[in-house]
């Protein structure tokens, strides 16, 4: 008798995706982040769903409703901090996942890569809107500053901003629509994840060597299921430690002050996971130029397949490219630090240098070094 998991129309899909899926035998721990992102998304949707049951999207009561969740709802504090710190874990996993793709040349699967970029943008938009919901000082001013950037778009900018705000400033209408979209977007993300996996399973996974692994495949279950479960346990250990011991470590104290349009905080800054992009935005002393640089800092990932000049796919056997890659990581960490600093000397000049270096490494140095490595190997 044939196993039901191989014949049932629904189970068959799951079987071909998670059980009998042929996977390369050499996948390292860097391939764990895809499944970790799935866990993060599930956790965010579940905690978010329960938070939404008690939250009120109204400027008069939003801040108090979050306080009510933390004080009066059974384990409300746990839900709230799991959701807030879960977002941080989500972005840590996202950036490591993208970094893995860059290092091992996974971007040559262009459809999977492009859907991944779309996912990144959607998750970033979702996180930004979520940060506005508690209606603290940083929520309000962050929303004001970031949405106001759209006014840099020529001709339609001002009308566009007022259309998004639903008025002449960030107010009740803005909060209501941000809550609506913050609730909706994770489900769009879940749908895009399906498309991402669909394209990935068309080609099969890449592996650390970058060499085709068709002759050497193993079933996903039990080998990678057990490996993924170990990853889940490690991530959930870190998350629960963060939530239970220092839940406000990654947050901003200003967000514990209710939103006040008449009082601007001394340093307006986004959550830590957007600081690198914020630093790039601030490093250009022109509004439109800054906005373009901000968008391009992520959109630059889309040209990676075109800029791949090496005859080898992975960086595993390319020490010069590896040096550039880790320099890029250092530059991104520098930008993250600069994004949280005030706009004054020497931070401004460091931010500008790091921003130039960021684009230079990806657009110019990496392709040049790849060509050089080809020549060194007489390819």
Swiss-Prot record:
Enumerate the SUPFAM superfamilies for this protein.
Answer: a domain/subunit of cytochrome bc1 complex (Ubiquinol-cytochrome c reductase) (SSF81648), Transmembrane di-heme cytochromes (SSF81342)
This entry's Gene Ontology molecular function terms read: metal ion binding; ubiquinol-cytochrome-c reductase activity
Q: Where in the cell is it found?
A: Mitochondrion inner membrane
Q: What is the free-text note on the cofactor?
A: Binds 2 heme b groups non-covalently.
Q: Per its UniProt record, what Pfam families does this chain match?
A: Cytochrom_B_C (PF00032), Cytochrome_B (PF00033)
Q: Which family does it belong to?
A: Belongs to the cytochrome b family.
Q: How does it sit in the membrane?
A: Multi-pass membrane protein
Instruction: List the InterPro entries.
Output: Cyt_b/b6_C (IPR005798), Cyt_b/b6_C_sf (IPR036150), Cyt_b/b6_N (IPR005797), Cytb/b6-like_sf (IPR027387), Cytochrome_b (IPR030689), Cytochrome_b_C_euk/bac (IPR048260), Cytochrome_b_N_euk/bac (IPR048259), Di-haem_cyt_TM (IPR016174)
Q: Assembly and partners?
A: The cytochrome bc1 complex contains 11 subunits: 3 respiratory subunits (MT-CYB, CYC1 and UQCRFS1), 2 core proteins (UQCRC1 and UQCRC2) and 6 low-molecular weight proteins (UQCRH/QCR6, UQCRB/QCR7, UQCRQ/QCR8, UQCR10/QCR9, UQCR11/QCR10 and a cleavage product of UQCRFS1). This cytochrome bc1 complex then forms a dimer.
Segments traversing the membrane? 33-53, 77-98, 113-133, 178-198, 226-246, 288-308, 320-340, 347-367
UniProt: heme b b566 binding residues: 97, 196
What this protein needs as a cofactor is:
heme b
**Annotated GO biological process:** mitochondrial electron transport, ubiquinol to cytochrome c
- Name the job this protein performs: Component of the ubiquinol-cytochrome c reductase complex (complex III or cytochrome b-c1 complex) that is part of the mitochondrial respiratory chain. The b-c1 complex mediates electron transfer from ubiquinol to cytochrome c. Contributes to the generation of a proton gradient across the mitochondrial membrane that is then used for ATP synthesis.
- Identify the species of origin: Lonchophylla mordax
Could you tell me what this protein is called?
Answer: Cytochrome b
Q: Which Gene3D superfamilies match?
A: Cytochrome Bc1 Complex, Chain C (1.20.810.10)
Question: Which cellular component appears as one GO term in the record?
Answer: mitochondrial inner membrane
Which residues of this UniProt protein bind a ubiquinone? 201
**UniProt keyword list:** Electron transport, Heme, Iron, Membrane, Metal-binding, Mitochondrion, Mitochondrion inner membrane, Respiratory chain, Transmembrane, Transmembrane helix, Transport, Ubiquinone
Spell out the note in the miscellaneous section: Heme 1 (or BL or b562) is low-potential and absorbs at about 562 nm, and heme 2 (or BH or b566) is high-potential and absorbs at about 566 nm.
Per UniProt, heme b b562 binds at 83, 182
């Amino acid at each position: 008798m044939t196993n039901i998991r191989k014949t049932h129309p629904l189970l068959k899909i799951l079987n071909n995706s998670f059980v009998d899926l042929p996977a390369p035998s050499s996948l390292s721990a860097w391939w764990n982040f895809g499944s970790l992102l799935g866990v993060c998304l599930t956790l965010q949707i579940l905690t978010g769903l329960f938070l939404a049951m008690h939250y009120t999207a109204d400027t008069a009561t939003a801040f108090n409703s979050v306080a009510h969740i933390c004080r009066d709802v059974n384990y409300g504090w746990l839900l709230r901090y799991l959701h807030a710190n879960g977002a941080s874990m989500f972005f840590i996993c996202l950036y490591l996942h993208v970094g893995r793709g860059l290092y091992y040349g996974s971007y040559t699967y262009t459809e999977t890569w492009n859907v991944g970029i779309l996912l990144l943008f959607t998750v970033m938009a979702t996180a930004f809107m979520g940060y506005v919901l508690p209606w603290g000082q940083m929520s309000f001013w962050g929303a004001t500053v970031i949405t106001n950037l759209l006014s840099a778009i020529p001709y339609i900018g001002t009308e566009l901003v007022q259309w998004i705000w639903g008025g002449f400033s960030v107010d009740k209408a803005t909060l209501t629509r941000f809550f609506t979209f913050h609730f909706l977007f994770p489900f769009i993300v879940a749908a895009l994840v399906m498309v991402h996996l669909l394209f990935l399973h068309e080609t099969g996974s890449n592996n650390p060597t970058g060499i085709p692994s068709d002759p050497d495949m193993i079933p996903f279950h039990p080998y990678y299921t057990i490996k993924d479960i170990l990853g889940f346990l490690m991530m959930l250990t870190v998350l629960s430690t963060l939530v239970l011991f220092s839940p406000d470590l990654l947050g901003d104290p200003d967000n514990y002050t209710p939103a006040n349009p008449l009082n601007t905080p001394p340093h307006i800054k986004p959550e830590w996971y957007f600081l690198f992009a914020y630093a790039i935005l601030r490093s250009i002393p022109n509004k439109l130029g800054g906005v373009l640089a901000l968008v391009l800092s992520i959109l630059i990932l889309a040209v990676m397949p075109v800029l791949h000049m090496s005859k080898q796919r992975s960086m595993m056997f390319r020490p010069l490219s590896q040096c550039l890659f880790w320099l890029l990581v250092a530059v991104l960490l520098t930008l993250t630090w600069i994004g949280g600093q005030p706009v004054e000397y020497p931070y401004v000049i460091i931010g500008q240098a790091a921003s130039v270096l960021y684009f230079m490494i990806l657009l110019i140095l990496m392709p040049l070094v790849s060509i050089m490595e080809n020549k060194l190997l007489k390819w």
